[in-house]
Amino acid sequence: MCIILHSCTARLPQAQNLQIELKQDQVQASFKSNEKKNSIFIKLVSEKPMLINRRVESSNLLHSNMGGFLAKKTNSNSKIRNSFTSKCTSLMKQQHARLCIIRLCATMLLRSYTDHDDY
């Protein structure tokens, strides 16, 4: 399963913290595991794909470093996937809200600038 995050999502502080916390040695350790069928790829745009093991037993280190990014420790892979999807959805909603606010501010500034020139 391959999940691609847009570059605007990668610029958010939570996504940057995720990139920082997934250090190279953790990624290499997960590549060496023999359970490649139980893993997913997270591919950030303009970044190399990172392999994260979905198995809860072997992902204790990743789970503790993500600070609640994944669901609580369960044996269900669907809960982890749903948690990841909901986190991405909430990040995209935050980014959309920020863009709407910036658009409104720019519109107000342009209108006040053009109205001020008429006088």
Swiss-Prot record:
GO cellular component terms listed in the entry, alphabetical order: plasma membrane
Record has Membrane as a keyword: yes
Lineage, broadest ranks: Eukaryota, Viridiplantae, Streptophyta, Embryophyta, Tracheophyta
Family membership: Belongs to the DVL/RTFL small polypeptides family.
Stretches for region Required for DVL/RTFL small polypeptide activity: 83-114
Ranges that cross the membrane: 96-113
Topological type in the membrane: Single-pass membrane protein
Keywords assigned by UniProt, alphabetized: Cell membrane, Developmental protein, Membrane, Transmembrane, Transmembrane helix
Main location: membrane
Its job: Small polypeptide acting as a regulatory molecule which coordinates cellular responses required for differentiation, growth and development, probably by restricting polar cell proliferation in lateral organs and coordinating socket cell recruitment and differentiation at trichome sites.
UniProt name for this protein: Small polypeptide DEVIL 24
Location(s) in or outside the cell: Cell membrane
GO terms, biological process: negative regulation of cell population proliferation
